[in-house]
Structures are given as structure tokens and as C-alpha cells.
């Protein structure tokens, strides 16, 4: 698929008929690792949840009901970044953004993940409304990692309609 077609056709899917198989998940996460990062520090981390028991616990305990329903049938990938690494030198922030750079790099990683999934024929839903501390305990995520999102990955049950985009002149200023 051409890249322009890929970015224009990718949708957030809220209903899944099948999870991504393990080997495809490994390939997907390997592709997501190719995302650029500050000084190549690669502070993004993934927790791929595949077992039925872990998926059920994560959905019921870590997600609100609307996200539980939206992600049923999919594999879940929790994405985090290592705090105080990206955008820091000798423990001090390089500028006012500080840990925002870790979140920025993770955003790049997650964009690569969802676009690579689409290229592989899978659909995704990035969920930011979640209970981070419950997820931390369930998946044994270290305290030095900031939990950002839970991403559902699988085959869509039905095709969602395209969502409108704001006009370019509303979000861009040419100088």
C-alpha cells in the first residue's frame, strides 16, 4: 500500500473479530522499534498482553467499560516510556519540556506501531483513558516508566466511517 493511502485509510476501530497472531505481533513491535528517538535512547517500552486471563484482567480492572467493549477480541499492547532519560543530561532536563520528550518519542513509536499494523492488515485503537496504577500492578511495570496508552490490535469486525479533519488553514500557519 502506498504511504499516503495508508495514512488516509487508517481508522480507530472499536470492534474486533480476531486478535493479532503472536508471530505477526513480534513483527509489528519490531517495526515500531524503528521509530526515531532522542539521541537514539529508545526509551519506549511495550507490554504485549496475549493470554486470555491477562487480557480479561487488564480489560476489566484497567479500562473503563467503553474501552473494555471497544477492545474485546483484540490483543492489547501497553506502551510506556522510561522517565528522566529522554530530554535529560546527567539527571537534569535539557529544556523546559523535560519528560515531555519521552512522551513525544513514545508518540512517534505509537504512530509507527499503528501505521505498521495497518500496513500488515491489522487495525488498532489507542486508548488513553485507563487506570495506570492498576495496569502497573497487573503487568509489573517498573515505577520509573510512565504508562501512556493501551493499544488494541486485531482484525476489525466492521469498517468504521472516515472521521472529518479540520481544514489545513485552521491548524497551520505559513510564515
Where are these regions (language model features)?
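Short secondary-structure boundary segments
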Residues: 81, 129, 155
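C-terminal helix-cap and adjacent tail motif
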Residues: 3-12, 17, 90, 149-175
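Small-aliphatic-rich amphipathic alpha-helix that forms the alpha element of a beta-alpha
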Residues: 32-33, 77, 94-138
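A short beta-loop-alpha structural element at the N-terminal edge
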Residues: 17-23
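Short beta->alpha linker loops
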Residues: 20, 50-53, 130
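A glycine-rich helix N-cap at a beta->alpha junction
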Residues: 67-76, 140-162
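A structural motif
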Residues: 25-33
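Glycine/small-residue-rich phosphate/adenosyl-binding loop
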Residues: 37-106
